[in-house]
């Protein structure tokens, strides 16, 4: 017997063991399994094997309601979102109203930001037990139907003839922080992540990479990077700029020394240009439209983690600039969190001293473009969310999004309220 709430598709997941204990114990653990996806009327949309199911996230792993990442045996188009193997189920555990992530992703897509993940609300059952309302969406990754830039890791792996994780790691410092790719002091080589020294967590001008012997001729792209908020070392390829700005190279996730130092050099020059207020140098290194658009979006939605957590960048190839995006993980927005003990800033909710947007907003040309973009692009979209817009933007209002998941939301909270009550603000409250 299959159970459903009204109005939403339902995803039924089954682990091979029939238990969730192994995967819930650690996000390093995974299982195989099966999945069944049905529409709101109970018609089968997809049925097949899972080569992987595991929990995902950082702080969300501490909650009873877990977020999941699943990998299908073969690419499939789920709910009209395009073919892919890897999919993410966001738990929206901080959001006591549930649609914040949906609103954010739809808003940025309407604003024209590139590579925004499509998303659909679904009910999820695991091993026959109802887990709640989730947001099914694509993983942030390089791919033809995802972030459509060159797959440098695939090319590197083909060149070396073996899986890149089989290689050890190399780490070191940049002797001249302004040009790390030109002057490098390699400290040592180790066989595993656990052997990397603790000082890599803290010092500026440090980096780590896979100790890979061969590099493609062109290593100018593509790269996908994420700001690393916490001082942990859980990924092979990473670096820290002068200001303490930490970045993880998500793709190629097993980047070589040459690859890490190449992209490190670009980000260090960006870091220096921002610190020195050198807008001419900065404009030659970054895609200003994407950076400004991302900032306006963060400020409009009052993102508590603006610029410091779940913040992505990508670089295509050649002389292409560093683009800001795609957007990801927006359940901590629109009044959920407050930091009352800190001074207000141009980004309102920023509270990290090395935060990207806190520093870049000191450049007046950046803010001039931000004001223009808000007036011409974002304000009409914001009015649509409030149900007050005169333009047909194609966006559903907050009230419409909430109504669409109302039955599922009621079911979700029958399992308990997973968020912090002290941090909850209903969407639309002042």
Set out the residue ranges of the language-model regions.
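Regulatory N- and C-terminal appendages and interdomain linkers associated
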Residues: 1-52, 403-430
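Middle-to-C-terminal accessory/interaction subdomains
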Residues: 21, 63, 248-308, 314-430
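A conserved alpha-helical element in kinase catalytic cores
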Residues: 93-114
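Short, well-structured beta-strand/strand-turn elements
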Residues: 111-123, 303
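Conserved oxyanion/phosphate-binding beta-strand-loop segments in alpha/beta enzyme cores
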Residues: 31-91, 252-262
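Internal "kinase-insert"/substrate-recognition segments embedded within catalytic cores
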Residues: 76-77, 91, 113-117, 130-296
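Short, solvent-exposed loop/turn and secondary-structure capping segments
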Residues: 23-26, 81-83, 100-101, 134-136, ...
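Structural recognition of the beta-strand scaffold that forms the well-ordered cores
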Residues: 67-71, 86-91, 98, 123-125, ...
